Amino acid sequence: MASPSRSGVFQAETDARLEAYAESISFDSRLYEHDIRGSIAHANMLREVGLLTEDEFKLIRDTLETIRGELDRGELPMRFELEDIHMHVEQALIDRIGDTGRKLHTARSRNDQVSTDTRMWIRQSLDEIDALLVDLQSAFLSRCENDFDIILPAYTHLQRAQPVLAPHYWLAYIEKLERDRQRIADCRKRVNQCSLGIAAVAGTTLPIDRQHTASALDFEGITANSLDTSSDRDFVVESTFVMSLIASHLSGWAEEWILWSTVEFDFIQIPQAFCTGSSIMPQKVNPDTLELTRGKSARVMGALQTLMLLIKNLPLAYNRDLQEDKPPLFDAFDTTRAMLELAAPIVRGAELKRESIAARIEKGYLDATTLMEWMIARGMPQRTAHHLVGAIVSEAMQQGVTLSDLPLETYQKLSDQIDESVYEVLGTSNAIAAFRSEGSTAPARVREQIKQWTSRLENA
């Protein structure tokens, strides 16, 4: 059976090898719900402008609904010679209602049809990813109260830097995920423009109503230029970029918790339901889910690179190259969705190892910066205080003690501006209590943030 897309200009049969090479039904069949919804809206518009009768519209609509049911149940066979989901649906319609079905494609091309289908699929998928991001934010937030009294080392260059409250870590990831949500919302605005009505490349001479179709499909507006619309895949690339950044954030979190779960760090216990063992080493409990999250992020970023290379150097307007946008698009969203679905239960089920963390929290001179700022607050220039505290830390290292255990006489030997009140800011607990600034790990600031995020996520 020849595809409905082949006109009378063709005098030769399609080579079977081309049918297999050019098909996209193996991956674009997942667009069928959007394709049928778009076709019903298009047919309704054709009825409104007088290009279909009321009876013709109802017959097309009802038959498309029947075809949708068959696709839901997997009853409609897929054939390479019909190329894509659009032709499968149209041919099924024609097989059932004949010439009336042939009227559906009036004032429409597969160029604007696939663009619209893809926009609707991305729009729905963005909303689903957004909901998963909220769930992951809620998972991090749910840890904050129980972990509030735990002090962790913050790292720069993977070296211990300053002490922070554990909830400060969780809030940091909530902020990253919120930026991801903001990017989704911003991207969605550009996705949510209806392509239907630009036809192949130049528009149509027929009296269609593009706004009517856009409204029926819940688009915010219509695209402005037929040439641009026919060629545009910015919305595919941009949405995949958003997925790539989400994947990057998840990869960073996974890497951190992989490190934290090692004997060397011994900060966290990953739920065993999300770990696997070794085929030879019986003692192993490996954080495979987190490792796969770190690894799968590369697939999402690779999809973005594929799309960027796909669209470069394409002249206006539509080119068949653009058919290849869907495998990387679908894979990027599918992979990101899978990563998020597993991230939330891991975050909720993990346990910080309080005793192990507390046993080593005073190592690494995490209170050195607080000591420097104590000196600055007493009038010492920052660079002078910075140099002096470095010398104090060096002395403590030589003696093998913490800053809070260093004798006052040693401090005063290095600076006569230091008195016994210095011990009020030494030690990680005192250092935490000394913080004041907005956005810091100060307990009051952290509680403010927890309260704000509790309210925000309740309304998300």
From Swiss-Prot:
Superkingdom of the organism of origin: Bacteria
Identification of the protein by name: Argininosuccinate lyase
Record key words, sorted: Amino-acid biosynthesis, Arginine biosynthesis, Cytoplasm, Lyase
Family: Belongs to the lyase 1 family. Argininosuccinate lyase subfamily.
Gene coding for it: argH
Coiled-coil positions: none
Matches recorded under CDD domains: Argininosuccinate_lyase
GO cellular component: cytosol
